[in-house]
Amino acid sequence: MLERLSWKRLVLELLLCCLPAFILGAFFGYLPWFLLASVTGLLIWHFWNLLRLSWWLWVDRSMTPPPGRGSWEPLLYGLHQMQLRNKKRRRELGNLIKRFRSGAESLPDAVVLTTEEGGIFWCNGLAQQILGLRWPEDNGQNILNLLRYPEFTQYLKTRDFSRPLNLVLNTGRHLEIRVMPYTHKQLLMVARDVTQMHQLEGARRNFFANVSHELRTPLTVLQGYLEMMNEQPLEGAVREKALHTMREQTQRMEGLVKQLLTLSKIEAAPTHLLNEKVDVPMMLRVVEREAQTLSQKKQTFTFEIDNGLKVSGNEDQLRSAISNLVYNAVNHTPEGTHITVRWQRVPHGAEFSVEDNGPGIAPEHIPRLTERFYRVDKARSRQTGGSGLGLAIVKHAVNHHESRLNIESTVGKGTRFSFVIPERLIAKNSD
């Protein structure tokens, strides 16, 4: 078994080398010369092994060292073992770095590693996408030269990282940036895209502002009449008008609350529970009678219904979607308009559509029609009792049925609303 070199072994090797020279020198009478030749030979042998070792370390790419004898054998063997250990450690370190980078790439955030001065030495793919960095082209670049925002520069220079920085990019994207010390004189920067969260917060504020605005008008009317009735009793036609107006405003508030509850119920409903068998033809017959009553013969109707076409889904949601589309056509088209309602098979499922030949909708309004409380004609919507929630309800209801609301409109020619229930939700016994 090989062991490390010791003084005893080196002295023993020297004695074994000099012993033959001592015997021969004593025998022939040239002891100093034989000893000198022996030591010189030993030095030449050591220098030759040094050259072999140098060649192996600097030139030869082989993992196995040259064979050694004597005191060189444990030395070369030890170097070989050290090289194997280093190779194993490099492999482990490489695997660790790969796992770190793989984990960093899997993060939903942009990750950038920089020096204390801001020099970039690594970033993940999301950092390239969100922050516009290029790797490896930006390796060594100062991040302050790439993200030129005064608030970001100030954030890094003050070195107060106790709170995140909210940064709005030139693209309109909102970022939440956190910086923390990583290792000695290095920083870890994590940037999270909070654009959607910012939009949701804005939508929430707008929602409450719109609800407050919608309730303020009827409450103001009710308060005005109540104050009037408190000051003096109302009689005759004035009293009837006041009661009629108050009744209209309470019905308007009741309708708004009902639609808000319907929308909230649809949004909270689980999307996977679509196991009710819905008789859409029967539902449409009821909607047809209600539409005729609502229209008061101002519009004409055509209902083209496949009486055998039934679907699986949520009956309340489909009723809300269908009735809202039909009633919207009645409420938002002028007298003399013809409205066509169809429920029929199409190649990819069952299509419901409501089409009219009314004035149509301007293109700039179409993308926003399904927003809550959005109205094309606010004055007319309030006259007809519209809350601005109908199409938002339709959108969420059809989305829960794996469909989407399609809106086609041409100014002066008319509008068509439609959605397609996918084939897999059509009841098996439908003709």
Swiss-Prot record:
The modification Phosphohistidine is found at H213. One of its GO terms (cellular component) is cytosol. The gene is phoR. It is found in: Cell inner membrane. Residues 29-32 are periplasmic. Its EC number is 2.7.13.3. This is Phosphate regulon sensor protein PhoR. It catalyses: ATP + protein L-histidine = ADP + protein N-phospho-L-histidine.
